[in-house]
Amino acid sequence: MTSPVNKLITREPVLISELATVKEAACLMSEEDISCLLVADAQDSVSMIGIMTDRDLRTRVIAQGLDYTTLVRHIMTPAPITIDSSHFVFEAMLTMLTHNVHHLPVLHLGKPVGVIGISDIIRYESHNSLFVVSSIFDAQSVEEISALIPDIHASFTRMVNEDANSHMIGSAMSVIGRSIKQRLLALAQEQLGEPPIPYCFLALGSMARDEQLVLTDQDNALILDDSYNAELHGEYFLKLARFVCDGLAECGYSYCTGNIMATNTRWRQPLSVWKGYFTEWIEQPTPESLLNSSIFFDLDGVWGQTEWADELTALIAKKAQASPHFLACLTRNAINRKPPLGFFKDFVVEKDGEHRNTINLKRRGTAPLSDLIRVYALAVGSTAQNSFERLDDIIAANILPPGRGPDLRDALEFISMVRIRHQALDLEADRVPDNNIEPEQISPFERRNLKDAFQIVANAQKFIVIKYPPNRRF
């Protein structure tokens, strides 16, 4: 997965002029024994302006009864999704999964040097999350999706054993989670009929941040068109929400104990209401508002009018950046969960209960880091969702002392990987994965570095209090 994508290229790309006919294109594809052509600008034979696939011929020409003299330019997909030859196989896989494309032109210095397809990645990377996602979209029922849970777990452990980093693993698992949501929504619409008004299904929390692992509950919501009428449309969207949330539960995503789900009427509202929610939470940061902010300000549209999610993200960034009082209040929440280090820098473990002598790496490690990074990201107006991408924006804005940004990145990566490896070991031992590690069960190297990582978190919490004093009125 960490090999460069150019390793997948088996031949030079075949280009055809945008002014060629679809018959000429079909003949060329047959002669070359290929499933797609790159479409060249009529004025520049090496500049790609589109792509045409065998699927396009079937669905846009034959099925529509178009004449075979139709020009390629009229049935091609313009400005196709591409990838640079220096990127990794993993990134190519994610790009294809995210955009649901089967052919991906590869560029070098802006010019096409090849095209890779799903079969190329399958040949190069057998038994990975691409198979899982493909199987999810082929599933005809919730039961068929839930039957893929062992494959999802196997994909996770494979990535861990191949030394993928936490960003790669989190992104891949989040793509799988989104795919399950998307397939459930498609199945729901098959059962309920087309929606009466447009809507957007939101993923929240770790999935929105591309940081999902194998142990997670579901946090989701619905944005409805502003034409929403509860009497006319309410029953449809309640049934849709129940279908999806029940399906997610059956597929291993447990119900949210805080009821942050689309089945909750409060979180199934028109776009204008959502804008009102977010504006109120920022302008009137009560304890409940701050709790909601920490959940809903990591959001991603996975189905429907996904541009509404982008609209809300932009609103959050603009209003939060302009509100020092809100940032100060959010800081108070961000420092509530302390890293598990004692006065003498020894580990502070749970004293009793079923998790006695353990540390919860999510609650005491990655979650406090995500909270800190979110505050800084909002302060610089970042619209990024992923914690590593937020750190890129934070570092670029120069609001941290030299070295602090990279330190936070290293701490997040190390704590995340200890947590990830622990869950992979649980799965391989047929145990239910959790976030609780026993310090004595990890290597001395990991213990030393885990203490260093927790100290970075503790120092960052002290610094953010100075930068955004929670008790100061603005």
Where are the predicted features?
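Conserved helix-loop functional segments at active or binding sites
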Residues: E31, A63, D67, A186-E190
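A nucleotide- and high-energy phosphate-metabolite-utilizing enzyme signature
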Residues: V133-F474
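Short beta-strand-to-loop transition segments that serve as allosteric relay/switch motifs
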Residues: A42, S119-I121, L224-Y228
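Tandem CBS (Bateman) regulatory domains
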Residues: M1-R11, M48-H99, P112-M159
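The conserved cystathionine-beta-synthase
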Residues: L15-D33, A40-D41, T82-N100, L107
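A cytosolic small-molecule/anion-sensing beta-strand core signal
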Residues: D41, T53, M76, H108, ...
